[in-house]
Amino acid sequence: MAAFDKCKTRPAHIDAILNGLDRYNPETTAVFQDYVVQQCEDRTFDCYANLALLKLYQFNPPLLNAETVTNILAKALTVFPSPAFSLSLALLPAYTQPYATSSTQATTANLPMQTADFVEAVQKLTHLSTLLESAQYTAFWSTLNSDDLYADLTADVAGFEELIRIRIAVEVGKAFREIGADVLMGWLDMRGMETLEKFVVDVCGWEVDKSKAEGENGVIVRVPRNKENEARGEVKGEKVGIEMFGRVVRRGFEQPA
């Protein structure tokens, strides 16, 4: 597993900022914001750099750029399950939090319209994160497709839906050896057996079994065995030295104080 603060695709000038005092220089905000745009375009993700930018926003609230923040959150969705989204959310102003206290709710009620829109955007993305992290994949897609605002919030992230489907497939591959194609179709928000088959075969390397199928019913998707989905018994043992056992017996004969 790669170190949290490392990213293979990170440009040298970003790495230099993160490892120097300029990391806390407000003048680097524009550089980090451009880097977020780059991540959205080339499908990379640098959590450490994004958190550094959010920390700059936290220290310098007037510099906060709402579009950049929502892009960071949208990108964090594409690497679930990971702490990236919750870590990003924790650095945002208290009034954006989805589980606000009575004091922050009172503050939110008096926010200007532009800021209120930002709060709504953050909370909608948080709802999507909750659905993904709790494996409610069908509900995630229905929610994503239920409001044009979701499309606007993820529009800057190239291949957003494809990246989410790949992450869902990775999680399915950890938990299943076989799964009904109709169920998987709902989890991946795909229409038609041909589209699903192309994805699971070409992208995932899985097999589609139609031997017992009647039309699209009864089609099974088979996932190759891996260390995560292989059912195996686990026997654990612990060696206890005789001197340890002797102390336990001796303590039983000791007189209480």
Swiss-Prot record:
Instruction: Choose any GO biological process term that the UniProt entry carries and state it.
Output: formation of cytoplasmic translation initiation complex
Q: Which UniProt keywords apply?
A: Cytoplasm, Initiation factor, Protein biosynthesis
List the InterPro entries hit by this protein, alphabetically: ARM-type_fold, CSN8_PSD8_EIF3K, eIF3k, PCI_dom, Transl_init_fac_sub12_N_euk, WH-like_DNA-bd_sf, WH_DNA-bd_sf
Q: Which PROSITE patterns match?
A: PCI (PS50250)
According to its UniProt record, where is this protein located?
Cytoplasm
Domain PCI: residue ranges:
45-227
Q: Which GO terms describe its cellular component?
A: eukaryotic 43S preinitiation complex; eukaryotic 48S preinitiation complex; eukaryotic translation initiation factor 3 complex
State if Cytoplasm is listed as a keyword: yes
Q: Molecular function (GO) terms listed?
A: ribosome binding; RNA binding; translation initiation factor activity
Q: Which Pfam families match?
A: CSN8_PSD8_EIF3K (PF10075)
UniProt function note: Component of the eukaryotic translation initiation factor 3 (eIF-3) complex, which is involved in protein synthesis of a specialized repertoire of mRNAs and, together with other initiation factors, stimulates binding of mRNA and methionyl-tRNAi to the 40S ribosome. The eIF-3 complex specifically targets and initiates translation of a subset of mRNAs involved in cell proliferation.
The record's PANTHER family line, in alphabetical order, gives: EUKARYOTIC TRANSLATION INITIATION FACTOR 3 SUBUNIT 11, EUKARYOTIC TRANSLATION INITIATION FACTOR 3 SUBUNIT K
How this chain assembles, per its entry, is:
Component of the eukaryotic translation initiation factor 3 (eIF-3) complex.
Regarding protein family, the annotation reads: Belongs to the eIF-3 subunit K family.
**Stated name of the protein:** Eukaryotic translation initiation factor 3 subunit K
Q: What is the lineage of its organism?
A: Eukaryota, Fungi, Dikarya, Ascomycota, Pezizomycotina
